[in-house]
């Protein structure tokens, strides 16, 4: 993102999920710096944005303060994915409690959410704004019609997919990628906004048998044809154009990797599956948030591998 985004911390007085006009908001101006990082923070069940220079929190969101019915708030426990989307003005998230959600940063409004299965690990935007999510415990890929008028929905189609942990859209090739253990697969999309379906499952490549459990899959920022892929053993880059697979770092069980011109961020778990800070490519801890249980961290920047450079959000279904 080239410009400083002005956002507002919000006090939501009424339910904020059914339309753009049904929330009364008291705004307090806050600046999100150009260099910032978004975190999936499980200790507070929240999404947090921090300043990348000071590592101070500048924005946060949690379901309990966002009009989510009490009985559904458990869906948002243990946030497991955070992706800046729509030119960094929204966050696409999942939580291991079951949620997939789209959040608008400017007023912290929950634009859309749904139950995405047992232990969702990641989600992705499709070209028409619909969503696909992956859940690892019930081993499913699911598509969702993103109805931001109602603000809440259910999955449209479900596909059996063991070891489902990640999902990335490739706008150049019009393909969706996801890993099944050591194997990277692609799907095509039927581009039906009212009936979204994934088609043509195809094996793209297979990691060496020394690897296990493909975890994070994410575009390499400065290489238009390459993807990061973390496993239980190493961190890799795969070039879709040349079919070249390269081992980059010998870090094991990394939950997320994200690079920018300012460096590389990785979540290396130090306690069970989380840590209280991120590390760089040299293994140096960049910051510590006392008491935090961070599961993923990503640079707040445009992802032009997956989305158009100018990617406006459209209200609707």
Which residues does each PLM region occupy?
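A short beta-strand motif characteristic of beta-propeller blades
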Residues: 57-73, 108-114, 151-159, 200-209, ...
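Blade-loop segments of beta-propeller domains
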Residues: 61-101, 105-124
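Loop/turn-rich, solvent-exposed surfaces of beta-rich toroidal or solenoidal domains
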Residues: 211-280
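Short loop/turn segments immediately following beta-strands, especially the blade-tip
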Residues: 52-57, 145-150, 188-197, 240-246
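Residue-level detector of Asp-centered blade-edge/turn motifs that repeat once per structural unit
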Residues: 32-33, 85-88, 126-128, 171-173, ...
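Conserved beta-strand positions in repeat-built beta-propeller and related beta-rich domains
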Residues: 39-43, 51, 85, 92-97, ...
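Bacterial Sec-dependent N-terminal signal peptides
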Residues: 14-32
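Repeated scaffold domains used in trafficking and secretory/extracellular systems
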Residues: 70-83, 117-126, 162-169, 209-220, ...
């Amino acid at each position: 993102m080239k410009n400083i985004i002005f956002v507002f911390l919000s006090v939501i007085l009424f339910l904020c999920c059914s339309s753009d006009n049904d929330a009364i908001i008291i705004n307090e101006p806050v600046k999100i710096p150009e260099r910032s990082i978004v975190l999936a923070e499980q200790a507070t069940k929240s999404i947090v944005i921090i300043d990348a220079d000071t590592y101070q929190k500048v924005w946060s969101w949690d379901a309990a303060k966002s009009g989510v019915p009490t009985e559904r708030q458990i869906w948002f426990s243990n946030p497991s994915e955070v992706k800046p989307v729509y030119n960094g003005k929204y966050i696409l998230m999942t939580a291991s409690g079951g949620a997939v959600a789209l959040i608008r940063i400017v007023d912290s409004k929950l634009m859309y959410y749904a139950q995405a299965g047992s232990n969702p690990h990641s989600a992705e935007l499709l070209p028409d704004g619909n969503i696909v999510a992956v859940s690892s415990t019930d081993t499913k890929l699911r598509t969702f019609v993103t109805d931001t008028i109602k603000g809440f929905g259910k999955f449209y189609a479900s596909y059996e997919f063991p070891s489902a942990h990640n999902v990335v859209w490739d706008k150049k090739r019009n393909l969706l990628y996801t890993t099944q253990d050591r194997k990277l697969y692609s799907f095509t999309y039927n581009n039906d906004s009212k009936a979204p379906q994934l088609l043509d499952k195809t094996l793209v490549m297979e990691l060496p048998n020394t690897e296990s459990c493909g975890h994070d899959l994410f575009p390499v920022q400065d290489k238009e044809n390459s993807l990061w892929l973390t496993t239980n053993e190493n961190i890799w880059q795969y070039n879709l154009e040349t079919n070249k697979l390269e081992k980059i770092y010998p870090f094991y069980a990394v939950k997320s990797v994200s690079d920018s011109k300012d460096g590389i961020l990785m979540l290396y778990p130090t306690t069970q599956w989380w840590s209280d800070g991120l590390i760089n490519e040299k293994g140096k801890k960049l910051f510590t948030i006392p008491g935090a249980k961070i599961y993923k961290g990503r640079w707040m920047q445009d992802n032009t591998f997956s989305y158009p450079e100018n990617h406006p959000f459209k209200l609707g279904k």
